[in-house]
Design a protein with these regions (language model features):
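Surface-exposed, short loops/turns at beta-strand junctions within beta-sandwich domains
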Residues: 3-15, 104-118, 206-215
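Conserved structural position at the C-terminal beta-strand
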Residues: 20-22, 122-126, 222-224
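Edge beta-strands of extracellular beta-sandwich domains
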Residues: 27-41, 130-141, 229-237
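Extracellular interdomain linker/stem segments of modular secreted and single-pass surface proteins
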Residues: 38-50, 139-150, 237-243
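Short, solvent-exposed loop/linker segments at the N-terminal edge
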Residues: 53-61, 156-173, 245
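Aromatic/hydrophobic beta-strand junction motif of beta-rich domains
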Residues: 61-72, 80, 174-182, 245
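Short beta-strand segments within Ig-like beta-sandwich modules, predominantly Fibronectin type-III
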Residues: 89-98, 194-204
Length: 245
């Protein structure tokens, strides 16, 4: 007795050719000196589970999952797992291209990262019989739309704008009070105010005296624990000033 392992193809099909020879050592009118026989035997098909191709994903955006089926009659159930979340992508479908939008709420499980890793599992059915399951890791990124919500209130820390209705060159100091909150579990980590080459940090930030006059642009940047940023841009009017000569 001898065991032989035969590899099946991607459809689970295989065949083998068997042959045998017999030699008697003598011959007569009733007995041949040798015999040989051969034949091809088709082996039972081993059902193959389907495979899944997963692209890079962005939470909240639709993407296409591609299914490769060993048999056109097979159907599939696809589920996902991500942190504390799980759900069904498709239920017993025969489609080979499946649109899926990973929920944006999954970002709650990665408050300190801009990308995360989950698992997609495809279970293959022939009729009502489950043939097997395969799991695939996927990476999904948090979209820029999940950056902090922020507003800013500006004033003149030196008080000149209250008197003159505008900021004053080399006298006024720009003060920015920024109110912000993170989205989907993220926390606000940083605030930066920039104007005319000056910078200041913090939710309440005050620059040095403004060196330029005219319509001057400012930028307030709010960064969260994922590294996502919201940028607030605007302009202020700065009156020219020269010290008496």
């Amino acid at each position: 007795t001898k065991s032989i392992t035969v590899d099946h193809d991607s459809k689970g099909e295989a065949s083998v050719t068997l042959s045998a020879e017999w030699h008697s050592g003598f011959s007569s009118q009733w007995t041949p000196a040798s015999l040989s026989v051969s034949g091809k035997v088709t082996l039972p098909t081993i059902p193959r589970a389907s495979s899944l191709a997963v692209p890079a994903l962005t939470l909240g955006s639709s993407a296409t999952l591609d299914v490769t089926k060993a048999d056109s009659s097979y159907t599939h159930k696809i589920t996902y797992a991500w942190g504390t979340h799980s759900g069904t992508v498709a239920e017993r479908t025969g489609a080979t291209s499946i649109a899926w939008t990973p929920p944006l709420e999954l970002a709650n499980d990665i408050p300190n990262a801009a990308t995360g890793v989950g698992t997609l599992t495809i279970t293959t059915y022939s009729g009502d019989t489950a043939l097997g399951s395969q799991s695939y890791s996927f990476t999904a990124s948090v979209p820029a739309s999940a950056a902090p919500v922020a507003t800013v209130a500006l004033s003149d820390a030196a008080g000149y704008a209250d008197t003159y209705g505008a900021y004053v060159q080399t006298k006024s100091r720009l003060k920015a009070v920024t109110t912000a909150s993170g989205k989907y579990g993220a926390t606000v980590k940083g605030y930066t105010l920039a104007i005319s080459g000056l910078t200041a940090t913090g939710a309440t930030a005050t620059t040095g005296v403004l060196p330029e006059s005219g319509t001057v642009a400012y930028v307030v940047t709010v960064t969260d624990s994922r590294g996502l940023a919201t940028v607030l841009r605007g302009t202020i009017t700065v009156l020219p000033y020269a010290a008496p000569g």
